[in-house]
Each structure stands twice: as C-alpha cells, then as structure tokens.
C-alpha cells in the first residue's frame, strides 16, 4: 500500500475533515476536549454513488444501481448477490483477493465460462475537498477489468465519461485523498472477517484490529519509514563527506597545478636531479640484493654444515641402533644356541635317568633274591643241624607209615609251590605295570607343571593389561604407560619455564586417530614402538626430555624412544613417492593427524606413505606377491596385524590392539574373559596336577604292596621248597652216615658265606646305583630348569629386538630424510650462487650506466620505486605544463569549478546535517502527539462502547495495553454487579452479535472513512437485540449524515422507521437461466405501500 500523505498523521485538531460528535454524557474528562470538531450535514466526497458488475463471480450482470448518501440496506436471500456487491466494492477499489475471504486469486472472481469480468464504481467528488475537480468533475468513475489469468487493469473516468488515467497510482491517490481504506475492517467488514475477529483468542490480534481501524497502524508505519529515511540520509551524509574529501584533494591538485605554471624550469631541474638519484638508487638496490643473497648463501652454507652434522649424528645413531640390534640378536642367538646345545644333553640325561632307575630296580631285585637265597640257606642249615641231632639221638628207623605220610606231604607242598610261583609271576607283572604308570604320571606331572607356569605368566601379563585399560578409561594417556600423564605434566612445566625450544610432541599414538577402527591392529603392527615415541625439535630438547624421563623410568627399564627432527608447520608433500592403490589406503591416508610434526615424524621414521593396509589376508598376498605389486609400495599389513612383503609373509604375535582401540569397554570385557579363562585353566591344571599326584601316591602304595606281596610269595616258595627238601632228605637211605650230613651242613655253610658276600656286593652296587640315579635326576632337573630360564630370558629380548628393528628402520629413514633435505638444500644453494654471479654482473652494468648519467656517486635515501613514481609524476606535470603553457585561463577555470563543486557539496552536507537534527526534533514532537492522539482515540472508543452497551443494560470493559500491544474485551450481559464479566466468545449468538455491533459502532465513531459497510450484522440476533442494534445504527447514521452506511442483511427490514435518509436495495432471488439480477432501489414509503 502506498504511503499516506503526511497530513494523515497529524493530531485530531488538524484532521482533514473536522467534525463534532454528539458525545452526550461522554464529555466527563478533559481528554475529550482535544477531539471536538464541527458537524457536516451531507456527504460531498468519497461516498459510493453506484456499482455495476458484469461476469463477476456467479453473476452475468448485476446492476447498475445507486446508493443513497446516508443509510443503505441491501437485503435479499442467500445467493441473491449481496456478497458479490461487497466483494466487488473491495476488489474494484484496488483491494486484494484475499481481503474478501472469497478467493485467493482474482481469476477466481471471473464467472465460469467467461474470459473476463468488469467492475464499475462511481464515487462522489463535490465541494471544497473534491479531488482534481477541474479534471474529474462531480464524480469519478472507476472501471476495473479482470482477465481470466488473474491480471487486472484500470480506467479512471471523469463525470463526462472521458478517460483521465489508467494508472493504479492515480487510484491510490484518489483513495488517499478521500481517506478510503478498503482493507480496513471498520470501513468494510465482511461476515467472515467479523467471525475470525470474534473467535480470535489472541488479544494482540484485537489490538492490531483497533490500530488498523483507526489508521494508527499506518501512522506507526509512516514513522518507521521516516526513521529509515533518516538513516539513509545519514548514510548519504557519510558518502557526501567521503566525496568531500576526494573533491578537496582534487581542488588542492588543481590549485597546485595553477601555482605550478611558474615553476616549470624548477621542475625540469628537479627531474634531472631525480634521474641522477634514480641511477644510483638502482645500484643501491642491486647492492642490497647482493648483500641479501650473500647473507642467504652464508645462512645456507651454515645450514648445509648443520645438515652434515645432523647426518653424521644420524649415522652415529644408526650405527648405535644397528649395534644395539646386533647385540640383542647375538644375545638371542646365544640363548638359542645354548638352548639347542642343552637339548641333546637334556634328552641324554633323561635317558640316563631312565637307565639308572632301571639299573637300580634290577639291582634291588637281585639283592632281594640273594637275600631270600641267604635266608633259605640259613634255614637249610638250621634244619641239617637239627637232623644231625635227631639222627644222633635216634636209635630206631622210621616206619613205613611215616614214609607214606612224608610222600603225601611232599606232593601237597609241590602243588603249593607251583601255585605260589604262578602268583609270583602275576605280581611281578603288576609291579612292572605300576612302575610304568608311575613313570608316565611323573612325566605328565612335569609337563603340566610347565604349562601351568606358562599360563600363570600369561595371566600376569593379561592382568597388567587389564589394569592399564581400566586406568585408561579415566585417562587415555595411561594406555601408553602408567607414567605418561605425569611425564606430560612435567613436560608442560618445563616448557613453561623455558627449558624447551619447542614443546615436545608425544606420545605419537595419542596424537593420531583412526578413520577405520578395524585397522587398529594393522596400524599398531606397522608403527610398533613409534606409538610410544616423542618428537623433539633439536638435541638440546632431547637431552632435557631424557632427563625428565629418568625421573619416571627406573634404570634398566625400557623408555619411550625419542625422535629428533626440526619441527615444521606443514606436512611433507609425498605425492610423488606415496604408494597408491584404488581399493586400499596407506597408513598415512588411514589416519587423521592434526599435527604436522607427528605426520612428518611418522613419514620420516616409518615411511607410512608407502605402506598399504589390506584387511583380508589372502587379498593382501594376492596384491603384494603378484607380478606387479602397487607402485611405491614396500609392504602391507592385514587387519590381523600380519606383515606382507613381495616375497615374504610374517604372522603377527598380537591378537588385539593395545593403544589405538576405541572400544575400551569391549577390550576390557575380552581381557576379563581371558583372565577368567586363564584362571579357570590354571585351576583345571592344578586339579589335574593334584589328581596326578594322588595317582602317583596311590600307585606307589600299590607298588609297595605288590613288592611286599612278592617278597612274601618268595619266602613262602623258599619255605615250601625247604620243607620238600627236608622231607626228601628223610626219604634217603636211612643208613646215611651222620658224617655225610655234617659234610652237607659244612657245604651249606660255605654256600651261605658265598651268598652273604655276594649279597653285600649287590647291596653296595644297589646303593651306588641309587646315588647315580639321584645324581642323574638332579642333573636332569638342573638342565631343565636352565632351559626354562633361557626361554624366560628370550621373551623380553624378542620384544627389545622388535623395538630395535623399528629403531634401525627409523634411523635409516631419518638418514634418508636428511640426505634428501641436504640434496634439496645444496641444489637451492647452488642456485643462489648462480644468482649471485648474475647479480654481480648486473651490478657492474648498472654502475657503468650510473657513471654515464652521474659520474660522481651520490647518497640516495629514497628507494628506486619511490623515485620512479616521483619522476613519472614530475614528467606528467611537465608534460601537462607544456600542453597548457600559455592557457592560464583554462587552468584558472578548472580550479574555480573544482572549488565551487567542493563548496556546493559542503553546503549540501551541512544542510542535510541541519535537516537531520531538525527532523529528529520534529519526530520527537510528532511521536508525543501520536501518543496523545492514540490516548484520545482509546478513551473515545471506551466511552462509545460503554454507552452503546448500556442501551441493553449491558456493561463492558476494554483494556488497552499499548506497551505489549494487546486489547482485551469483556461484556457483562446482566444487570449491574449481578453477573460476571465474560469474554465475548462466552456469550450467546445474539449477545455476541449485539456486542460486536457495539464494538464496530465504537470504532465507526472514531474512524475517518467516508463510508462504512457491514455484512449480515444481525444474522445471529434475536428480535429484541436486532431492534436495539438497528436503532443504534440509525441513530449514529442520523448524527453522521456526512458519512454513508451500507448494511447487508437477509432480513426484510419491514420494521424500519420512515425516513428519506434510508434507502433499501432489495435483491430478488435469481430464476433458473436468469442472467441479469433485478436490482432496484426502494424508499421507505414504497416498501410500506408494497406491504
């Protein structure tokens, strides 16, 4: 909507159409005095005289018809065209389609089947306030043509029918002049807009309704527009001031040019002097360049020397690393050789132990046999002696019955000996079985004991890992060692105290992040000890860091490695030497590294740009061991940590990542399961050991029983054999001489002596074999213990060997790094030296040229570029002076024009500044007036609303909150204080419609539009409320004859009082096929006659 004229925002005293309202009892406060005016008797401008519609909405032709100057009732049933008249009024006077609540686009108002619609509205244009009375005459005809595509065009015609304008701006000017507001709901209030307003719960919407109805909102927008204009003016002032600076500079230049006409010869002299200075200034600059190049060469040579020293130091460190690797390897080889050397001895000693045990057992058996034989001979001796005594005493021979009895007993004894011998063989077999079982159990016991020791070592390692992982949950740095957080804190303190040139970076594993967590083990297997390493800028920083590490790492324990390399802020460009494969990343690309020092150190020490990461083992073999491995790729690592070369494959000893895993909880859970499994495994092994020990003890007991039983059987056999012999001896010829028996006894004694001597020898041999057996067992246990010790020593040495191998690789890469840097530096240095030679030749040429221009060397303070600019500027001045020499009038004119332009703009800027200041004062005054005017309208609206409600004995409240922009309305339909105030939505349909009419009439009383339109104002009222509302409207219309009222209703209006000011426009129901609606005006008298 176009901006209103400034007069629209004046106070009520300066309103365009002053009038006086009949306030009756309202004039109780002093504020109403500001709102009084004069009364007009008839409307002269802005009211609607006639409307004519064609193909509009669902009507082919509607009208033409004329409205009265005061009260007009448009009556008719639904579908008769009442709403079409109101909609056409809004659209025809430039309103938007959405404001009608009948459609969202203008093309929706064109009747179906037609290409366009036409609206013609005639406005009254009489009296002193007429709009361009000489052009339009007493009326203005507004014709609007709406096309099917939604576009519209205007024709503004005079009273004679001639077209005055087709521009919408002219229509807006007319509406502004007549103060017609088609989008103001007080001027034109449709039934839908009224319903939306009454049902709104937002008090802010009601406040906006009030502001829009009273044009206060337009005034507020105009104030905002003025303030925006003020800010734009300030910006113009700022731009003008900048332009003033430029104009002043141009004016000064023109003045200098004007004054320089007389100094032409001086300028030529100055030009020659500047040329002399320029010649030697060029020499000075070349000399400075030469000095800078010499300085750079000297710095470069110093750096080359430093690089040589670093290469030597790197070579020393490489030699030390290789020596350390060789020493560890030698130790491992020595341990391996010693272990291998002791293996045959161990086997031999084991076999010797078995042989010694067997020999001892055999000797023990022989001894026992000799002992039994001795005992048998001793018994035989006793029996012979007894027999001799019996023979000596016997005087008579045995009888035959005795002999038969002896024969029978001999047979029984022989059968018994045979049974005992069978038992002896069976028990001997059991003894051998028990001895084998005991030997087997002892071997198994030793094997399980060693396995238990290995599992305990693994359990201890896992428990340490589990503790470190749990500590790392609260502090990730503890993954790299329990002392790392304290070491880093010490590094920070030392750096703050200035002990480091640059703060060391590390551990490197804490400075990198994985893009793919599945590659954690692969990257750890690749970087190994580098994950715990630290980077230092120089060897001085390294020495400080070594001193700090001594505080946290005990002597003899391994410390994190330290990499010494000059810190750089940019990562090396390794694109020319990096490995590439379309499907697999390198270690460098698989890592997120924010610190360039970390990336460069890993590139130098491990060559991570040349190492591929291939998750699948078989795919890694296929890629690396093919005929054409990837370019620049030295090796690859799999997700299991295996290392793959072109011709070799090494499996990883580790099964899980230690430093780079992100899922710490999962690792803790896995380790806890492993600890639990190993604890259970140790328990099972211990139970197995206990079971074996029980079996060994049980078998040894059974063996002892068998051996005891075996001895008992031997004794029984010997006893029975002795009895048999004794009985058989009795059977011999009884005539045997006693001397013979005595000879036999003597012979038996000799045998006993021999057996006893042999037994003593066997006993000594058995004791000797027993000592040999114990000695062999001790030797076997000692060498077994030594072999186990060697195995335990080899495990940490293997870890140290891996670290040493990584260190050797790192030092080799460091050496290559310094060699490459030295080569690049020497190339740059040689280039500088060639540049020096060229500059020296150039200096000789420039000095020769300078002597030709100025033989004697002069001191020059300005640079050649400044002198060159001054020479060019002076030449231009001289050329300009030559071109304008003698035309002093032209130079004078240019100077005067520049000066006048500057002064004119300066005057305008000063004027605008005064205007801004004055505008601020005016706006402050007008805003106060605006607030006073708003207060006046608010009070009048409250008074009118309360007075109108009192016609029905209602009470009402209107609470305005201008700060929060809210308006709350409450109505009490009862008498006095008997009923509570209610929101309008809580009222009945008739009460709400009546209250709505009162509110609208209150706004009508303070609004300035020349006409008011109200659609179906009484549709929800009962007869009593309709009568009262009608009386209120007619009373207001009678008091405001200078305004036009158009009221749309479906009621017949037969009860209206007789008045020439009232015109009823009755619309008939359209008949089937009818294209033109009869629309005729009826006066009150005609309506009464028809009834």
UniProtKB/Swiss-Prot annotation:
The principal localisation class reads: nucleus
Q: How does it assemble?
A: Forms a heterodimer with SMC5. Component of the SMC5-SMC6 complex which consists at least of SMC5, SMC6, NSMCE2, NSMCE1, NSMCE4A or EID3 and NSMCE3. Interacts with NSMCE1. Interacts with NSMCE2. Interacts with SLF1. Interacts with SLF2. Interacts with RAD18. Interacts with SIMC1. (Microbial infection) SMC5-SMC6 complex interacts with Hepatitis B X protein.
Question: This protein's superkingdom?
Answer: Eukaryota
Q: What is this protein called?
A: Structural maintenance of chromosomes protein 6
List the residue ranges of the region (Disordered): 1-34, 806-828, 1072-1091
This protein's domain notes: The flexible hinge domain, which separates the large intramolecular coiled coil regions, allows the heterotypic interaction with the corresponding domain of SMC5, forming a V-shaped heterodimer.
According to its UniProt record, how is this protein modified after translation? Phosphorylated. Sumoylated by NSMCE2/MMS21.
Keywords assigned by UniProt, alphabetized: ATP-binding, Chromosome, Coiled coil, DNA damage, DNA recombination, DNA repair, Isopeptide bond, Nucleotide-binding, Nucleus, Phosphoprotein, Telomere, Ubl conjugation
Q: Cross-link named Glycyl lysine isopeptide (Lys-Gly) (interchain with G-Cter in SUMO2), where?
A: 268, 773
Q: Where is the composition biased (Basic and acidic residues)?
A: 809-828
Segments for region (Flexible hinge): 452-659
Q: In which tissues is it expressed?
A: Widely expressed. Strongly expressed in testis.
Q: Where in the cell is it found?
A: Nucleus; Nucleus speckle; Chromosome; Nucleus, PML body
Q: Which residues bind ATP?
A: 76-83
Q: What does the similarity note say? A: Belongs to the SMC family. SMC6 subfamily.
Chain positions with Phosphoserine modification: 669
